[in-house]
Amino acid sequence: MTAEEMKATESGAQSAPLPMEGVDISPKQDEGVLKVIKREGTGTEMPMIGDRVFVHYTGWLLDGTKFDSSLDRKDKFSFDLGKGEVIKAWDIAIATMKVGEVCHITCKPEYAYGSAGSPPKIPPNATLVFEVELFEFKGEDLTEEEDGGIIRRIQTRGEGYAKPNEGAIVEVALEGYYKDKLFDQRELRFEIGEGENLDLPYGLERAIQRMEKGEHSIVYLKPSYAFGSVGKEKFQIPPNAELKYELHLKSFEKAKESWEMNSEEKLEQSTIVKERGTVYFKEGKYKQALLQYKKIVSWLEYESSFSNEEAQKAQALRLASHLNLAMCHLKLQAFSAAIESCNKALELDSNNEKGLFRRGEAHLAVNDFELARADFQKVLQLYPNNKAAKTQLAVCQQRIRRQLAREKKLYANMFERLAEEENKAKAEASSGDHPTDTEMKEEQKSNTAGSQSQVETEA
């Protein structure tokens, strides 16, 4: 039964009582959720915890009274499975469906709205019947940018709510697949942030940080979150390869959070992490270096209990971290982020040579030539011997000249076209294709008189 057939079936009020029938799919086998498949779905895959699912549905009370339907709104309903966003019966039943499947779900009150009901349409202790059609489902996007680069599908939920943080020690079992071929199978204990040393993709560590103890998940990685344009020769992974990992987070020990460290510990850890970040940067592991420098900023930025001597050390570490973050962002071609990091550095030292120069580079990369020129000019004003700034300033001047030449040519062509159109209009007017000035004036007088008469009549 399609969504359209569902609509036809439920058009008009149903007054006949609905039967209690179906297979018991409730976890306790207490007949709290009964399911009848009305149309089989396709394929073998079913939604997993955290998947975004898209359905059409109609709901009735047991006496046949319809109380809701997505078909009436002509818009599919979507939610994240297993997250408690819908009644318990839905989280249970829709996890058993395949794409294209239509089923009837009968839900006892304890799996629906319970003793409270959902006034005014659903009374207390109501047993409900739904007809549901599953259209699609997709895994949970774990990226900040929501670009689909890290997709997780939870096979088994973990314990509690705690998750590994940056620097946590984790124990995992993993299997890596490229085009369904196993290329990596290991059990590891390592520190989050050090995974690249163990040939683990950046995106895999980010996924582990979103897992709970005991969780089993499947993680899909796009190339930019896997082994990128280089690939991984050790595993015979070619450039720009998409990967799949099956992960089991066995256990973890969280690293100390910023609020758990005193000022002395923060400075000590920041120095260690800065050195680690520098090593990563020199090895070309810019994403890993980025994480180290971000730690320093998070530890020191809002600390107010430093002594005068500690405050000076903290400021130097913060300045170096923002400058290094800017350099990492430049290498990763994240130019807006590079500008932001430079601005943070220049808030601490407004005449900082590296901050001004790197901001100029970022502005130049996004074709903001005037802003780039201003930064390079200031570098040379403060540091006249900076040869790189002289070179980049010359590049800016050249780009600005080219831009002005293009704009001049564009405007010249525009004015030329306008002149041609004006001459064409004059030629048509003189050939009698358009009314003469006298005719236009007479018509205008006539229209004005008519309008005035209409206004006076309406008034």
Curated annotation (Swiss-Prot):
Disulfide bonds: none
Keyword Phosphoprotein: yes
Ranges of Basic and acidic residues composition bias in the record: 434-445
Domain PPIase FKBP-type per the UniProt entry, residue ranges: 50-138, 167-253
Regulation: Inhibited by FK506.
Positions carrying Phosphoserine: 451, 453
GO BP, sorted A to Z: androgen receptor signaling pathway; chaperone-mediated protein folding; copper ion transport; embryo implantation; male sex differentiation; negative regulation of microtubule polymerization; negative regulation of microtubule polymerization or depolymerization; negative regulation of neuron projection development
Modified residues (N6-acetyllysine): 282
GO molecular function, one term: heat shock protein binding
Region described as Interaction with tubulin: 267-400
Disordered: annotated span: 1-24, 421-459
Identification of the protein by name: Peptidyl-prolyl cis-trans isomerase FKBP4
Organism: Homo sapiens
